[in-house]
């Protein structure tokens, strides 16, 4: 008797769970089931009721309903395909995550907080309703559930998608079982600002409230449009909009400034949009267009929420599906249409024109702070340089983590199936183009920008003022560079624009290692001003910053002390008699004498670069260029590096890559043939040496070498400038012949036009 009563109560409870309503209702009656389904739809349209507390008992009841759905879907007659969304994987994963959440809130106090959590209450209630709906679907559909093309089977697939969305949402709001909905990071900054402004730290809001707030920012034209919008945003179909669903909507129909316009074009009027469609259903739908190359449809990706999946028919009749990365959907469709992939939406001949959605998006500017500048200087790098390839400038920001890199590295990472951000492994939900504005210590105290300078009169300067003259040259060079970039077919800049900053050229007295003109008058001021201009160097990589032409394998110099005046230059040493020195001149058509730089002498002498005990032995290579044997000199406690001009060989132990086009360096307004971590102090110039291109005097070379060695040991604390002694072309008569190598003269430096296929050492 007791067993019969127990069985009757169990059957009554079971029927109550299946029907979802009155305990006395009979689920076997299809008419009543349809009425109850209509009642559910009306209640959903009216609005959600007040949620009860989601205590442990309620959660366990939901588990039982989920378990029943799993057992119904395990029927072999269904022949469910193991492809997303696979309900036999989704519901067990949901169950495991709920168990994880309860384990994190095991004591009574924490469990009470969890049961009163607004989002958790709504989630458990929605999960229970969806489970009951799935059970009722099996009860109503009966044998039609086993037909793949039936409407009941289609409804089961839609429920599977909803369960999949709910699983992704609970994992995002409760990562590792801990509630973090109040700190959830919305990917797009402007969308996040909207949510914070209207909803603060709330995790979920009713649809009616969300609609009113959205209408204040972007107008919703009609109630019909509002219903269609709700069906797009409300992925879990519970009449609430969570911060997770809002983030996905903002990513799908970006940018936020025109999000409703984009949504109307792509989801309302576009014939290629398919809502709640799976991978297999896309293939089945496009199968009838297998002979029509270019047919396509697109849907929300169920495995990567927030991204689109586009299915299309190839020229060979195959059906492929792809997920576009790092670009909005309308841009992907426009590009695919130009390339002949996306021509016929859902097989139709009319392909909507989406070019109206293409509006120039302003790039976010990231200003490098002084602390970042100094930190990266100590590491021998720059903030704007991509830390993965060390070649290109950072031009893209990963969202929501905010890490920066160059586009080529991000594309390569994603094509290699890299998961998440390469730096922090955070999920890549989106990207934004950015421009890094380098820090310039010379412009630190200036508020005017390059745009402001264009509006001010530029010709109120003194012709004798070198600073102002070079400043004008810099501006003209910047304008020319900017015009070249505007005429370039490349639309998206990969580096900082020239409009953002203006650099005053450095005082030539503060840069003693620049090539000085040999004799007055100084007609080369314009050329030298352009060469020193950070924006005028033509040797930078196309992908690098136009105001930061550099070689990637060398560190940036440390920031110079502000407002430090250099000491006055000392008097030049008296000229050395011609009979006690040797000279070298260049042999070319015009027989133009070169500037008496110390580099030719260093090619065959021993010197101490730092004034320490570690000499650096130089030798002449086959092309006549000097090559250091040992380089361990230190300038101000930091290692210096050897010149890497186009006519010079690289240092032995320096094996990083460098662009072959870069022959000139610009660092924070300082340019020169050698690079230092701080502005260098040059030793007094060695005696000028004259050597015929085909003969050399070894005896005089020894004496000259001693003089150079003695001059290098002088006190380097005083400020030195290069010498400009006259060049002697007289030759001693008693000299030994050596092999001649053809040489060129460029900017006062001796360059070889031969190949690096041998080494010729000059012996004393």
Curated annotation (Swiss-Prot):
Catalytic reaction(s) noted: S-ubiquitinyl-[E2 ubiquitin-conjugating enzyme]-L-cysteine + [acceptor protein]-L-lysine = [E2 ubiquitin-conjugating enzyme]-L-cysteine + N(6)-ubiquitinyl-[acceptor protein]-L-lysine
Region annotated SH2-like, chain positions: 254-356
GO biological process: cell surface receptor signaling pathway; immune system process; negative regulation of epidermal growth factor receptor signaling pathway; protein ubiquitination; regulation of platelet-derived growth factor receptor-alpha signaling pathway; signal transduction
Zinc finger residue extent: RING-type: 386-425
Enzyme class: transferase
Domain Cbl-PTB: 48-356
Transmembrane segments: none
Keyword Lipoprotein among record annotations: no
Region (Linker): 357-385
Cellular component terms (Gene Ontology): cytoplasm; membrane raft; plasma membrane
Residues bound to 4-O-phospho-L-tyrosine: 299
Job of this protein: E3 ubiquitin-protein ligase which accepts ubiquitin from specific E2 ubiquitin-conjugating enzymes, and transfers it to substrates, generally promoting their degradation by the proteasome.
Quaternary structure, from the entry: Interacts with several SH3 domain-containing proteins and with poly-ubiquitinated proteins.
This protein's name: E3 ubiquitin-protein ligase CBL-B-B
Organism name: Xenopus laevis
GN (gene name): cblb-b
